[in-house]
Amino acid sequence: DILAAFRVTPQPGVPPEEAGAAVAAESSTGTWTTVWTDGLTSLDRYKGRCYGIEPVPGEEDQYIAYVAYPLDLFEEGSVTNMFTSIVGNVFGFKALRALRLEDLRIPPAYIKTFQGPPHGIQVERDKLNKYGRPLLGCTIKPKLGLSAKNYGRAVYECLRGGLDFTKDDENVNSQPFMRWRDRFLFCAEAINKAQAETGEIKGHYLNATAGTCEEMIKRAVFARGLGVPIVMHDYLTGGFTANTSLAHYCRDNGLLLHIHRAMHAVIDRQKNHGIHFRVLRKALRMSGGDHIHSGTVVGKLEGERDITLGFVDLLRDDFIEKDRSXGIYFTQDWVSLPGVIPVASGGIHVWHMPALTEIFGGDSVLQFGGGTLGHPWGNAPGAVANRVALEACVQARNEGRDLAVEGNEIIREASKWSPELAAACEVWKEIRFNFKAVDTLDPLKS
């Protein structure tokens, strides 16, 4: 069975047991009345079952309802069908004030019907010939308004300065100021030039997201013809069917696939209603993607440390034990489905490098947009500053130093022999994003 954990907030007067049973029925075989065609099938075989309810500590009138769904309810290899069944209609149920899907346990039998990520972590490392450290990226800014040639120039400067990747912003598709084909051509030229000068393999996340699946695949085909290593997709706005189609193309044609989570906070940010991002991540690993944006803990975007660490485990590891302290409701066995690299992006700069290296570890992408392009000396020096800071943190980690305790000292030491890093440290020394998180973990039962 697929197991689901729902956070249920019933309407006043509705018992939690009745609310849990209603969720199970409405998201499987049930309707609002008995119908004569019920007798033509075996409902016991197909109906969802609410097998447990527990109150949420510290919350009034909130409960976690556990529901089991028989596998025969779902089409093989279709995240679209899985979500249509489990969350497609029940969230508008009048008997509930609010409903949130907190977690799913996907059984190995169902996981085996999915291709998953086009390549996975180890294959990407081998393609790039880069090991033992996080990868460095940068989103080109301003995100909208640049011509294709100026955009390509910024890509070249960042890659030449020491970054591994640059990135299209999620809303860069094919607008009047910069059509996709022109952008792809100038970015490919920038990649080739930077590779020739540095001797390193470089990439730019060319956003293939489009209004139709056919147009999306056409853009991916063009990118492959240019010889670039990676393309990009906005998987929530583009949809799971489009994403799975692109992931299959990327595996068949040797392209890495970077995934942006644009629109996720509309779905996952409120604590009592929607779908938790850990569920959207599991769905992405099934649908297919080699990278996905994951918050930063320390940057400008929502994301508690323990919740984010739970996300990272679900993306990268083969087997994850149930751990309510990190928000993981079920033990998950991925049966060797390739892992996904988490991407830390959003309001980060060189002073964050030690914390990011410690939190995300080696198999990650640390992506500095404004933290590269906002350097007072230009794009290439901004890239140099980030590369020097990263190399210093990796060396300190390998020497056994505590990045959480000694992080600022490590950055100061490195800045003594890197004027680019020293300038970056001075510019961003006062930048903080100290806001209370909206989506937090529930207190554990005492």
Curated annotation (Swiss-Prot):
NADP in keyword set: no
User: Positions modified as N6-carboxylysine?
Assistant: 167
Instruction: Tell me which stretches of the chain form a coiled coil.
Output: none
What residues does substrate bind to? 89, 139, 143, 261, 293, 345
Q: What is its main location?
A: plastid
- Site (Transition state stabilizer) location in chain: 300
Cofactor(s) this protein cannot do without: Mg(2+)
> What does its PTM field state?
The disulfide bond which can form in the large chain dimeric partners within the hexadecamer appears to be associated with oxidative stress and protein turnover.
One of the GO biological process terms: photorespiration
Q: Which SUPFAM superfamilies match?
A: RuBisCo, C-terminal domain (SSF51649), RuBisCO, large subunit, small (N-terminal) domain (SSF54966)
| Binding residues annotated for Mg(2+), in chain numbering | 167, 169-170
Query: In the record's cofactor note, how is the cofactor described as bound?
Result: Binds 1 Mg(2+) ion per subunit.
A GO molecular function assigned to this protein is: magnesium ion binding
Q: Where in the cell is it found?
A: Plastid, Chloroplast
Q: What is its EC number?
A: 4.1.1.39
| UniProt keyword annotations, A-Z | Calvin cycle, Carbon dioxide fixation, Chloroplast, Disulfide bond, Lyase, Magnesium, Metal-binding, Monooxygenase, Oxidoreductase, Photorespiration, Photosynthesis, Plastid
Q: Which Pfam families match?
A: RuBisCO_large, RuBisCO_large_N
**What reactions does this protein catalyze?**
2 (2R)-3-phosphoglycerate + 2 H(+) = D-ribulose 1,5-bisphosphate + CO2 + H2O; D-ribulose 1,5-bisphosphate + O2 = 2-phosphoglycolate + (2R)-3-phosphoglycerate + 2 H(+)
Q: Which NCBIfam families match?
A: PRK04208.1 (NF003252)
Q: Which family does it belong to?
A: Belongs to the RuBisCO large chain family. Type I subfamily.
General remark: The basic functional RuBisCO is composed of a large chain homodimer in a 'head-to-tail' conformation. In form I RuBisCO this homodimer is arranged in a barrel-like tetramer with the small subunits forming a tetrameric 'cap' on each end of the 'barrel'.
Q: Can you state the subunit structure given in the record? A: Heterohexadecamer of 8 large chains and 8 small chains; disulfide-linked. The disulfide link is formed within the large subunit homodimers.
Tell me, what does this protein do in biology? Answer: RuBisCO catalyzes two reactions: the carboxylation of D-ribulose 1,5-bisphosphate, the primary event in carbon dioxide fixation, as well as the oxidative fragmentation of the pentose substrate in the photorespiration process. Both reactions occur simultaneously and in competition at the same active site.
Indicate what this protein is called per its UniProt record: Ribulose bisphosphate carboxylase large chain
The root-end lineage is: Eukaryota, Viridiplantae, Streptophyta, Embryophyta, Tracheophyta
Q: Which gene encodes it?
A: rbcL
